[in-house]
Amino acid sequence: MIPVRCFTCGKVISTVWEEYQQRKAAGEDPKEILDSLGLDRYCCRRMLLSHKETVDELYPYT
């Protein structure tokens, strides 16, 4: 689950997550994707670049 907002500046980032994932899977450069999505601040960029889905791994333990 991607956070709704950037932890540092509060900008909404969850709206671009799916497009980012699709374009990254298609082989596009992450820098170009983030630039075109309007994520200029490094705090917002790191939210997408460093995110790892762990929900599926934790689901069996609920």
Curated annotation (Swiss-Prot):
This is DNA-directed RNA polymerase subunit Rpo10. It comes from Methanocorpusculum labreanum (strain ATCC 43576 / DSM 4855 / Z). Belongs to the archaeal Rpo10/eukaryotic RPB10 RNA polymerase subunit family. Part of the RNA polymerase complex. The lineage of its organism: Archaea, Methanobacteriati, Methanobacteriota, Stenosarchaea group, Methanomicrobia. GO terms for biological process: DNA-templated transcription. It is found in: Cytoplasm. One of its GO terms (cellular component) is cytoplasm. Binds 1 zinc ion.
